[in-house]
Amino acid sequence: MYWSLTKYTLFISLIILSFSCAPQEKDEGQTYIVCTTGMIKDAVENIVGDKVKVDALMGPGVDPHLYKATQGDLKKLQQADIIVYNGLFLEGKMGDVLQKLDHKKMVIAMAELLPKKAFINNTEFQGAFDPHIWFDVNLWKKAVQLLSKELIKNDSLNQSFYNQNANKFSAQLDSLHKAVQSQINLIPEDKKVLVTAHDAFAYFGRAYVVDVRGLQGISTLSEFGLRDVSNLVDFIVQNEIPAIYTETSVSEKAINAVLEGCKSKGHDVVIGGSLYSDAMGEEGTFEGTYIGMVHSNVEKIVSGLSKNTKEK
């Protein structure tokens, strides 16, 4: 433990030192925003349009819980005028690093702009909250609106432009929220159970009335044992759940263990698809947008859980 804490302290010190010593290399007059995740980048881009250059540190398939900054990432953070991250410990120790930079530049924890009453408690860590707020589309819309107000503080000349964009995106999210509700209602009530590798979908479950079960905890750093697998297998078999799901940013090993356990008990459950949980799809694709990511997930969830297990 001592060695890990020592390395962590050194890591923070080196990053902060690099911000103090290294020269800035960016286009003069152009605001540069660096985001941690693709979901946040998507939100920022929908607000600022082409007025600002926006980058994300974590691309498709990257698990923010396990993320480690590269030299290239540190350079981006150094050059950024504004840094936007999720907060609520989604980025792990990196969040602590970013907080220490707020006296040098504007640093925004997007999720933490919301009131605490909006959060789901993290049962693994006392006093902490579940960071996966983007799976409640309506809650994400509220976070986007609050983020827009923060960005306007840095660029009041474009206030009208930002407000217009935020309102347009909010309307799209309202439509998305209603579409998700409508699609989820197609699933038989007794099959509205979403089983995934880690517990990233609690906000989705709360918003759309779905029972959510994850083999790992809220963070992929959480470990699981044979008893966890056995208990989840028993639940799936007893409730005749037709499909379970892998995640694009999490190893399939855990869910494959559950799959084999179910089959060993005579329940032919299937992998309903790979869901976008902590990262979006490839840039330039529909799934590489927040709206596309949600649509893709819901399509797979509805398709998999609507199957009649007795017809298999």
Residue ranges: model-predicted function:
Residues 1-9:
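Bacterial N-terminal signal peptides that target proteins for export
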Residues 21-312:
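Extracytoplasmic metal-acquisition and chelation regions
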